[in-house]
């Protein structure tokens, strides 16, 4: 491995080259964020799940393809809207999130990944994860991991596509979406 200074200089040079590249944006992707106007309208976050269920219905009526929700639903809704929310999640392709943690946990979201050879030696490894409620995970078409791999200077330039969590291999959110 290179000395820290050499590594940082190489990474910053890479950043400079990428920063000067012309960027194009797809018209096929829409990102919906939770902004100040939405918080004024619906109240503080997290919103009750029936509000989120209504938003999924609105997106479906707008004929969206895939809905990706990078929101961790690891606890029951305090307003009791999980059943309606689960019903709306099953309207079409909805992808949920799971996150990694430093302590070993049971893997609440069993998902399949095809393996050829032994990929485990090459994957980022985490002892456990915090997944969505099992009943909500069952209503979605997929669950992807959101995690990054920052470089020595603290900047994230790459995201692991697969991760080993406990004894299982999980895809990241982007791969699960595809």
Give the label of every model feature segment.
Residues 1-178:
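Non-transmembrane functional regions of envelope-associated proteins
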């Amino acid at each position: 491995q290179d000395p820290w200074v050499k590594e940082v200089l190489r990474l910053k040079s890479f950043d400079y080259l990428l920063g000067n590249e012309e960027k194009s944006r797809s018209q096929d992707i829409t990102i919906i964020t939770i902004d100040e106007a939405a918080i004024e309208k619906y109240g503080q976050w997290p919103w009750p799940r029936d509000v989120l269920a209504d938003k999924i219905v609105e997106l479906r009526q707008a004929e969206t393809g895939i809905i990706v929700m990078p929101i961790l639903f690891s606890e029951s809704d305090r307003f009791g809207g999980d059943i309606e929310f689960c019903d709306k999640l099953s309207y079409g392709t909805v992808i949920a999130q799971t996150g990694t943690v430093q302590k070993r946990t049971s893997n609440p979201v069993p998902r399949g990944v095809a393996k050829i050879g032994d990929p485990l030696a090459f994957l980022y490894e985490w002892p456990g994860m915090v997944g969505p409620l099992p009943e909500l995970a069952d209503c979605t078409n997929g669950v992807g991991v959101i995690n990054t791999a920052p470089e020595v200077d603290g900047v994230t330039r790459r995201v692991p596509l697969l991760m080993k969590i406990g004894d299982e291999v999980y895809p990241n959110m982007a791969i699960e979406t595809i």
